[in-house]
Amino acid sequence: PLSKKILLLDSSFSVNDIFPWGNEFSEGIDYEKFCAAFFIQPDLFLRLRPGNQERVITKLRQQEIVFETINESCIAVANSLKVDTIIELNKEAVIQDYSSQQVGKLLAQVKKENVFRVWDCCAASGGKSIMAKDILEDIDLTVSDIRESILYNLKQRFAEAGIKQYKSFVADLT
């Protein structure tokens, strides 16, 4: 555990030295836990793409991979797991932090009667764009980012995810 590892350090070290503004916290925040969290590797969250839930879970179980089911479309695995050696990344599941996946709750409330125009204006790795396509299905997708290299990587990820129809451009929206 982390507490034993910290004991191996110089006795003058305190985990509270990591974030010295504890007196600025709102009431109810555990200062010790907050500081210790900087030393804990977070889980890797996978958003399971529609129709792939059982397939991904079966593959993980066959490899005896420990995972936690967060909800019907999200599972958490160890961050050290080389997930791309077990599943078809971007086709069966997308690596996407849990907080970003919450956008899906809002998208799921939208009626799918029309073709929606979706602009992911700071696309980065495109996780929310892929989620919009999964939830809203037939969309007119536009993606932009300030970095051309990011859009190049995004093109590869979209190809893996089966997204062929979209527009992209470089833009600084600051």
Language-model-derived ranges and their functions:
Residues P1-T174:
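S-adenosylmethionine
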